């Protein structure tokens, strides 16, 4: 392989310690001219020149997103940038475009501000975490006490807020398996639902209690009063309202008690007569069959 001598039109001056301060350095070839002229290099240089903001590190997908496990996993992630974002397969971003667009500048400032917030981890011993865990435990206990299942809660929330709520959502919240941000949002919704559910339960219990109070206690009739009522029933099984009032005053009972006793006594008499007639009929039938 033959070697060719290097020729150039540039002039090189040997600099010593005295001349270095007086003579300026001049370079006739820029860095861009030294690179091969290809589309690949042009795209790389243009892309690198066009991007003026640093890409924040994203922990989404690398660390668990649950709270109650480790502090580093509580950091929310705003964006997930693919690995090929800065590759040469994308068209170059020109410098004048980003420099003259005020929206791009605002976007970069907002991204820097949010990236600083992303980097701040949440303390696992913070009051917010403890309050969230306490609410999740209390919610489960109160939900079971009210008689609702996780499916009931998920369907109730889905009917109001959309289909993203389900039994799985409630289960993950109670087991502390949601991200801190989503858990805080769901906490406010579940707190409102729990308040309304307890109000409905209180109204239902009040209504049931009122119905139970309307039902009177069973009245106990003494043996002497029963004998007196039996004698009156033998004389007249269907007394009038005046007769019932008079018997109630004599026996020191309420009029309604005496009236109900006569109704029950007539029903019992009717059942006895019906049973007796059926027995007599069956006996006579057997007697005829024997002949």
Swiss-Prot record:
CDD domains: homeodomain. One of its GO terms (molecular function) is sequence-specific DNA binding. Residues 214-273 bind DNA. Coiled coil: none annotated. SMART domains: HOX (SM00389), POU (SM00352). GO terms for biological process: B cell differentiation; cell fate specification; cell population proliferation; determination of adult lifespan; inositol trisphosphate biosynthetic process; negative regulation of transcription by RNA polymerase II; pituitary gland development; positive regulation of cell population proliferation. The keyword Ubl conjugation does not apply. PROSITE patterns: HOMEOBOX_1, HOMEOBOX_2, POU_1, POU_2, POU_3. Signal peptide: none annotated. Its main location: nucleus. InterPro entries: HD, Homeobox_CS, Homeodomain-like_sf, Lambda_DNA-bd_dom_sf, POU, POU_dom, POU_domain_TF. Belongs to the POU transcription factor family. Class-1 subfamily. It is linked to Defects in Pou1f1 are the cause of the dwarf (dw) phenotype which interrupts the normal development of the anterior pituitary gland, resulting in the loss of expression of growth hormone, prolactin and thyroid-stimulating hormone, and hypoplasia of their respective cell types. Interacts with PITX1. Interacts with LHX3. Interacts with ELK1. This is Pituitary-specific positive transcription factor 1. It comes from Mus musculus.
